Amino acid sequence: MNDADKFIIRKAVLELAKTGTPRFTSIDDDVRNLPNVNSKATNRWDYVTAIGAQLSRPPYDPYRETISLDISIGRKTSRKVTLNIPLIIYGNIAIHYSSLESVHLALNQLAENGNVLGLISEIEINTTRDNKRKYPLFKKVPCSPNGSLEEDYKKSYPEGLVLEYKDETSLMILQNFRKEFDGPILVDVSEVFPLYIKTILEEGADGIIIDTNKVTKNKIYQGKHAIAVISDARKAINDYYKGREENDDDNAILVIAGDVNSAGKIVKAAALGANVVGYSTSMLIAHSNMYSEKPSDISSIAENVYRHMLGTKGEIKGIPAALGYSDFHNISPSDLRTSSIDASLQGNIPLEGIDRTYKDMIEEVVNEYISEKGIKLNSSETQQVLRSIVGE
């Protein structure tokens, strides 16, 4: 088998891992249609880049400082869970238990070396060689109105819980679990976003999980990109805290999953407002094993996953370092630039060469026109005019 054949097979495996379904088009067709594909909303990430270090922020000096990736999960009333790398591994499709064992071994090895990641799973993964879990488990709990944590909690003692929000019944379950569990509770709102964020946070949820792939299939976000979902989710959380007494210990986090399966996308998602990125188990295994010629047994996959995550850690530290930050979580939309008007509108990202968002430019023109014509509009009316112009 030559290298070209291997590449085709690996690309097909990655496609299967990402979508859960086989390919229905040939790679040759994809190459021919590349210009058309790049013009679609699904590739807006390619039009967003991080700018270099500013004069007001000296470049990162490796001799004097280190880049912190740490993130604490848990609000003021909850027990905190700290991740050394802002990633949580989660299962997006059913995969073989042996693959989960490999992830378990890799996460343990990472934790032993000070690189703690989280895992979202319905079950606790054990192996015959290493039964003790050394990383935080966020256990998925069933949406049963009469559900109790006692039985599940005794079995696995998870550091956190994950609840999928479906309807008002889910809110009752959250209320019950909040009374029983003192660790962080994350609520997946992918099926109902952008609704109920404020209510869920008021009931004590420690964070929101959003799968951009699911949300962009909803009617509200049809034709939009993950950039818009992340930006709107961050705004929803920020709006919840407006007018409230500032408290550094009360920080609900945003976990973004879905279309964030590379180091570059992880950094861009963080700049747009994600505190933690959900990295799918299937994509993790597929990416880490992409260039390996070794037999895919549990140990070799675990080693590949371990090395892949260390490589990813190095990559996501590099960009904030170039921006002059010592804390990964200090990056923001102002550190990004885009050549796409759509990306600028959806993510409130400044345009390249102008350093202002497209919306800011339109707002300036509208305000000048209103002033020249002597038109009197209040703030709400002005915003309505802007929305009609930019198509929001």
Language model segments and positions:
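A glycine-rich phosphate-binding loop feature that marks nucleotide/adenosyl-phosphate handling sites
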Residues: I125-N126, F193-P194, N251-G264, G324-S340
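Active-site-facing alpha/beta catalytic cores
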Residues: T77-R79, L83-I85, G91-T199
